[in-house]
UniProtKB/Swiss-Prot annotation:
Pfam families attached to this UniProt entry: Anticodon_1 (PF08264), tRNA-synt_1 (PF00133), tRNA-synt_1_2 (PF13603), tRNA-synt_1g (PF09334)
Gene: leuS
Positions of short motif 'HIGH' region: 42-52
EC code: 6.1.1.4
Organism: Yersinia pestis
GO terms under cellular component: cytosol
Annotated HAMAP family: Leu_tRNA_synth_B
Motif ('KMSKS' region): 619-623
Keywords from the named record: Aminoacyl-tRNA synthetase, ATP-binding, Cytoplasm, Ligase, Nucleotide-binding, Protein biosynthesis
Protein name: Leucine--tRNA ligase
GO biological process: leucyl-tRNA aminoacylation
Length: 860
């Protein structure tokens, strides 16, 4: 082997070897235990960022480790290739989304290969290819035939900049998640999939996901939002109309003082027809923010409709108000207001001088003070007629039962989860396979006309979708009847909801999935991706799997057994203030910094001499210009160093702070491993280790080696604490570096240790380990080598170090045989002269012995 560690030579050669040998290509093999490891597929934005590198390194480490355990490991990769950014980039670069996307895929594919990820490239998919989305279109038509798909006009979150609909989850603080433009409300026809039909399953099956992070499961539970309550019907004075509301607090029903309805509710619209001021208010509400966080904090506004509802139990007339905080899409578009016991109702009632009636006693049994705020805690009913004195549960049931008995109430389980709106008014997406015939009938595209192909050779004007702008594209016939194709495209979450299943049979042409392959590989054993996908992608991913199961395409209930959510990658962020007061962000690569003796940044300037403000560590992003290009780091240090730093610098699920000094440290460590192996191999051939004749020092070193193997095995396999696994190997390397190399036995032990170290590091740093394995004379390629197994016998301690205390104070430490009795330990302690002087002339009154650890002699 060469004397110097040169990653640029090693990595190119090893990657070429993997490519030629197709090392990571797999097929179904019933004789082997399978393991499917999957990282969330990337959007081909043009360049990999450090977040990608972290995600894919974690997946690759797990995959390589599982291969070494002898499993048949599938690790595929592909491209989530549709989506809005491609349209913007195409306009900006005067091209079309397709060529821009395919160029990016090619570039990023090469970047992934440079990092040495062990993917089965034969299974690569791009979701924008017709051979992928044809099956998505086919499945949608099947869901339509099953009654799982419908179209309705609904108020949507509309981004006026991107000219598209946003899901509620994509509205952040009232603005578009992508471009930060203020979101508006708009009524348009949309296609929906009935995810609400699966709400109960999606909720209950979270309990089966024992190896998913608790945080993700909690977020999904809250998003599904199961509640038990009562649907209540109110009559409306002088009207045939009925008003229906849902409440989870029927115990407060005697405290209702008004009813609030959405601006778009039929009663609001009826009243607005003769009330111009109300009509203006209804129009204003059309642009109300709809993200829940916004709803909670925005100013509550309303207007009396002049209509009244009748309380079903008391007969009281309750004013009906149109309010901006009630949404037509949620529940019935009407809520009963109990201002005494609901914060939002109290705020509204206080603003508009509506009555506030307390009906629940305070915890101390007194009437609550409602002058400053509502009392929202549960308690004993009062002011509630026949229900006075009942506790919360009894009050809930008694009032619910009475409403049911009177025929004006019905117990109901409700969910916060809404049906999934999958229509997008964009071009670069899979066309929705539906046709409107000339008589107005809507039918699915026949199977023999699938896929409905998206034309790729288009001109982007940045305003309208090319397929909407071209009247010819939509024209088609179904069974000889002319019709128009749907020009909306699918939400891109559709593609990423089933890609994991298509990886099991990407070339299969006879259907969406090959049942044999899908059921061999599925469910995914390990899924890796960011926590930011907890409620969108990961919910749709689980939902789609259940749809596939119910269509007979897979036979498992959940798509992934184990989920690891990696933390974000942070980097230093610097800026200076421009002439117009704006912040101009400067890359940390271009910042010249001064640090204090604790390493803290005290001063920074850029090359032009601007004094920089240090904004701390923040997520690597384009907006703060603090991304570090992985390719630059790979060229400077090698892929193995970058991978090692990524896995060592922080626990996988925590944020990782990018520090180039840490990268240099990882590089120095690999050079040390290389140097130790070089020095060892330079001494020539090694004889076999004779375990029976090891010296005490050699036994101790071998014990450390096998304890390290046991720890690293547990850390990588069960605990997934990869940083502590690497730390354990580093600690062992320090001991190996100090170990004598005089005798044949010394060298034989070093050979055993280095072969184990190289295998333990292989999942993290595969290129250098491939070379070292060859240099050390390992059998075959390391790619097929088994994971090292800890020798239980080697780990048995021959002796123990026992701390000796006299009256609770440490007076000495003694080495005793591992199987020494308490009496033998006491005798040995008495011979230790540091201990003996404290026992001279005193009586031992009590002995406390913790076997193999501590001896405390109480004397007097």
């Amino acid at each position: 082997m060469q004397e110097q560690y040169r990653p640029e030579d090693i990595e190119t050669q090893v990657q070429l070897h993997w490519q030629e040998k197709q090392t990571f290509k797999v097929t179904e093999d019933a004789s082997k235990e399978k393991y499917y490891c999957l990282s969330m597929l990337p959007y081909p934005s043009g360049r990999l960022h450090m977040g990608h590198v972290r995600n894919y390194t974690i997946g690759d480490v797990i995959s390589r480790y599982q291969r070494m355990l002898g499993k048949n490991v599938l690790q595929p990769i592909g491209w989530d290739a549709f989506g809005l950014p491609a349209e913007g980039a195409a306009v900006k670069n005067n091209t079309a989304p397709a060529p821009w996307t395919y160029d990016n895929i090619e570039y990023m594919k090469n970047q992934l290969k440079l990092l040495g990820f062990g993917y089965d490239w034969d299974r690569e998919i791009a979701t924008c290819k017709p051979d992928y989305y044809r099956w998505e279109q086919w499945f949608f038509t099947k869901l339509y035939e099953k009654g799982m798909v419908y179209k309705k006009t609904s108020a949507v979150n509309w981004c006026p900049h991107d000219l598209t609909v946003l899901a509620n989850e994509q509205v952040i603080d009232g603005c578009c998640w992508r471009c930060d433009t203020k979101v508006e409300r708009k009524e348009i026809p949309q296609w929906f999939i009935k995810i609400t039909d699966y709400a109960e399953q999606l909720l209950n099956d979270l309990d089966t996901l024992e190896s998913w992070p608790e945080q993700v499961k909690t977020m999904q539970r809250n998003w599904i939002g199961r509640s038990e309550g009562v649907d209540i019907v109110f009559d409306v004075v002088d009207s045939e109309e009925k008003l229906s509301v849902y409440t989870t607090r029927p115990d407060t029903f005697m405290g209702v003082t008004y009813v609030a309805v959405a601006a778009g509710h039929p009663l609001s619209l009826q009243a607005a027809a003769t009330n111009p001021a109300l009509a203006d208010f209804v129009a204003e509400c059309r642009n109300t923010k709809v993200a829940e966080a916004e709803m909670a904090t925005m100013e509550k506004k309303g207007m009396a409709t002049g209509l009244y509802a009748i309380h079903p139990l008391t007969g009281e007339k309750l004013p009906i108000w149109a309010a901006n905080f009630v949404l037509m899409d949620y529940g019935t578009g009407a809520v009963m207001a109990v201002p005494g016991h609901d914060a939002r109702d109290w705020e509204f009632a206080t603003k508009y001088n509506l009555p506030i009636k307390p009906v629940i006693l305070a915890a101390d049994g007194s009437e609550p003070d409602l002058s400053q705020e509502a009392m929202t805690e549960k308690g004993t009913l009062f002011n509630s007629g026949e229900f006075d004195g009942l506790n919360h549960e009894d009050g809930f049931n008694a009032i619910a039962d009475k409403l049911v008995a009177l025929g004006v109430g019905q117990r109901k389980v409700n969910y916060r989860l809404r049906d999934w709106g999958v229509s997008r008014q964009r071009y670069w997406g899979a066309p929705i396979p539906m046709v409107t015939l000339e008589d107005g009938t809507v039918v699915p595209t026949p199977e023999d006309q699938l896929p409905v192909i998206l034309p790729e050779d288009v001109v982007m004007d940045g305003i309208s979708s090319p397929i909407k702008a071209d009247p010819e594209w939509a024209k088609t016939t179904v069974n000889g009847i002319p019709g128009l194709r749907e020009t909306d495209t699918f939400d891109t979450f559709m593609e990423s909801s089933w890609y994991y299943a298509r990886y099991t049979c990407p070339q299969y042409d006879d259907g969406m999935l090959d049942p044999a392959a899908a059921n061999y590989w599925l469910p995914v054993d390990q899924y890796v991706g960011g926590i930011e996908h907890a409620i969108m992608h990961l919910m749709y991913f689980r939902f789609f799997h259940k749809l596939l199961r119910d269509a007979g395409l897979v036979d498992s209930d959940e798509p992934a057994k184990r989920l690891l959510c990696q933390g974000m990658v942070l980097a230093d962020a610097f800026y200076y203030t421009g002439n117009n007061g704006e912040r101009i962000w400067v890359s940390p690569v271009d910042a010249i910094v001064e640090r204090d003796d604790k390493g803290r940044i005290v001063k920074a300037v850029d090359a032009e001499g601007h004094e920089l403000v240090y904004a701390g560590m923040s997520k690597m992003s384009k907006s703060k210009n603090n991304g570090i290009d992985p390719q630059v780091m790979v060229e400077k240090y090698g892929a193995d160093t970058v991978r090692l730093f990524m896995m060592f610098a922080s626990p996988a699920e925590m944020t990782l702070e990018w520090q180039e000094s840490g990268v240099e440290g990882a590089n120095r460590f690999l050079k040390r491993v290389w140097r130790l192996a070089f020095d060892h191999t330079a001494k020539g051939a090694v004889k076999p280790l004779d375990i029976a004749s090891l010296t005490e020092e050699q036994k101790s070193l071998r014990r450390d080696l096998h304890k390290t193997i046991a720890k690293v095995t547990d850390d990588v396999g069960r605990r997934q604490t990869f940083n502590t696994a690497i730390a354990a190997v580093m600690e062992l390397m320090n001991k190996l570096g100090r170990a004598p190399q005089e005798t044949e036995q010394d060298r034989a032990l070093m050979q055993e240790a280095l072969l184990a170290v190289v295998r333990m590091l292989y999942p993290f740093t595969p290129h250098v380990c491939f070379s070292l394995w060859q240099a050390l004379g390992g059998e075959g390629d390391i790619d097929t080598a088994p994971w090292p197994i800890a020798d239980e016998q080697a780990m048995v301690e021959d002796s123990k170090l026992v701390v000796v205390q006299v009256n609770g104070k440490v007076r000495g430490r003694i080495t005793v045989p591992a199987d020494a009795t308490e009496q033998q330990v006491r005798e040995r302690a008495g011979q230790e002269h540091l201990v003996a002087k404290y026992l001279d002339g005193v009586t031992v009154r009590k002995v406390i012995y913790v076997p193999g650890k501590l001896l405390n002699l109480v004397v007097g």
